[in-house]
Amino acid sequence: MDKQQDQQQEARPVLEGPDIARVLTRIAHEIVERAKGADDVVLLGIPTRGVFLARRLADKLEQITERKMPVGSLDITMYRDDLRMHPPRALARTEIPGDGIDGRLVVLVDDVLFSGRTIRAALDALNDIGRPRAVQLAVLVDRGHRELPIRADYVGKNLPTSLRETVKVQLAEEDGRDTVLLGAKPAAPGAHP
C-alpha cells in the first residue's frame, strides 16, 4: 500500500454527498435572503473545486429564484504570494459572465478557507477585472488558522482543525465522489512519531 492510500485510510469523512447538497441549499437560501432576491448576484468559483461548487450553487439559486444565475471562474494563479516558493501551476481559465461584474454583487466560491491567502489573491484578481458593488465569500469548509483578516460570509461547515491535520474536498466532477475528509498530515521524512 502506498503512502497516499495509507493517508486516505486514516482520513475520516466529515461531510458526504447528501451533507454537501444540504449545505449548498442552505447557502443558496442565505444568499437570496441577504441579497434580497439575488437579482444582481454573480458567482465566481476559484479553480478547481470552487468552480464546481459555484456551478452547483448557481443551480440551487436558479431553483429558488426561478432565474438563470451568472456563474464563472476566477483564476488567481498569477496573483498568489507564493509563486517564488513553489513552481508555477498551470493557468486555469478566468471566465466572467457576459454582463460583467461592475456594480454587481460578486460571491466568490471556494472549497476550503484556511489562511486567507487564496482569497486575498482572488480580491486582487477581481480588482483588475472590474468594480463590483460588493464582494462576498462562500466556502464549503472553514478550517480556521487565518493569516489575514478575511472571513467567509457563507460557510457550509466550520471545522476547527490543528495545523497537523489536512482537509481534502472531493467532488464528483473532479474526483468521482462527493466527500470532505479530515486526516493527519504525513510525517516529515526522518521524523519519528
Swiss-Prot record:
Chemical reaction(s) catalysed: UMP + diphosphate = 5-phospho-alpha-D-ribose 1-diphosphate + uracil
Residues annotated for substrate binding in this entry: 48-49, 89, 93, 110-118, 143, 167
Enzyme type, top EC level: transferase
A Pfam family that the UniProt record links to this protein: Pribosyltran
InterPro entries in the cross-refs: PRibTrfase_dom, PRTase-like, PyrR, PyrR_bifunctional
EC number of the protein: 2.4.2.9
Coiled-coil positions: none
Transcription listed as a keyword: yes
One GO biological process term: regulation of DNA-templated transcription
Motif (PRPP-binding): 106-118
Entry keywords, A to Z: Glycosyltransferase, Transcription, Transcription regulation, Transferase
Gene3D superfamilies: 3.40.50.2020
GO molecular function, one term: uracil phosphoribosyltransferase activity
UniProt cross-references to HAMAP family, sorted A to Z: PyrR (MF_01219)
Family listed: Belongs to the purine/pyrimidine phosphoribosyltransferase family. PyrR subfamily.
Entry function: Regulates the transcription of the pyrimidine nucleotide (pyr) operon in response to exogenous pyrimidines. Also displays a weak uracil phosphoribosyltransferase activity which is not physiologically significant.
Designated name of the protein: Bifunctional protein PyrR
Source organism per UniProt: Streptomyces coelicolor (strain ATCC BAA-471 / A3(2) / M145)
Upper classification of the organism: Bacteria, Bacillati, Actinomycetota, Actinomycetes, Kitasatosporales
